């Protein structure tokens, strides 16, 4: 039997989340890792979400808490993390959840992580392009990647923050300056383009979208998003009108959601789904599963550009192989040239941000 003092201490710990922290910049009882019984966690990987209180971060945290490959889930943001952490932590799944609030706790959030996912930043609003977000999100990604370089340099890093065509090069430059850059471990998340392509193609063909796979190459904004409709699985053919319609809709999928939400947000739910799907693929690769192939925006030599989105095979070290683009038809070759021109500018913009 435990004595009265021990029982009181235990009840104090259990009730600590009911009191808000005295300051957002001070560690609250909820945020202390010592209050989590880590030894009871399921076997698996340690994952951190940076920007966990945002529109993408919250549903992404929910989905990662449900992933059986996750043993420890760290949620970091500059606001509202205690509430999100308390909410998510009540789910009876295996992952132990810990919350971290504000810049002083970034290092604790990152230490020992196997996978770091970055959805942090401001969302798109009507009339905004992804590049309009650059000046704000570029600085956020730089700060977070400096923390990663210091605290978990061997982690796999999934970059969601837009514009991905620039933020991935920013992350690479930060890691280079820190001496920790490993191109195999830095991946820009373009999975939402693939998810949309699968959905829209399935609608046109009258198929189940779960049975459709459309490679999407290039980048993650506008004309840099190039679906390879000639390589759809299962094999099928499209009219020129269908090709034009599908390509345009896939490229403008993000804008479609922003306009439909009429100022109330961007594609947060579908992005969280896509991000969790890609993160799961990375974790299965880390586990050693064979045949894990996803599209991602990575350091690449498949074109003359230093970064490019294409199919990659994932494994224990992150990217194990970057697959060739395969045969492209005339429409796709023309689209590729248009995409490369815009991509080159976006990549250089990211590099210049760090080296200015």
Curated annotation (Swiss-Prot):
Its EC number is 1.1.1.37. The active site is at 220 (proton acceptor). Transmembrane segments: none annotated. This is Malate dehydrogenase, glyoxysomal. One of its GO terms (cellular component) is glyoxysome. GO terms for molecular function: L-malate dehydrogenase (NAD+) activity. Belongs to the LDH/MDH superfamily. MDH type 1 family. Substrate binds at residues 124, 130, 162, 196. It catalyses: (S)-malate + NAD(+) = oxaloacetate + NADH + H(+). It is found in: Glyoxysome. The lineage of its organism: Eukaryota, Viridiplantae, Streptophyta, Embryophyta, Tracheophyta. GO terms for biological process: glyoxylate cycle; malate metabolic process; tricarboxylic acid cycle. Its main location: other. PROSITE patterns: MDH. Keywords: Glyoxylate bypass, Glyoxysome, NAD, Oxidoreductase, Peroxisome, Transit peptide, Tricarboxylic acid cycle. It is an enzyme of class 1 (oxidoreductase). Homodimer. Residues 1-36 form a transit peptide. NAD(+) binds at residues 51-57, 77, 137, 160-162, 271.
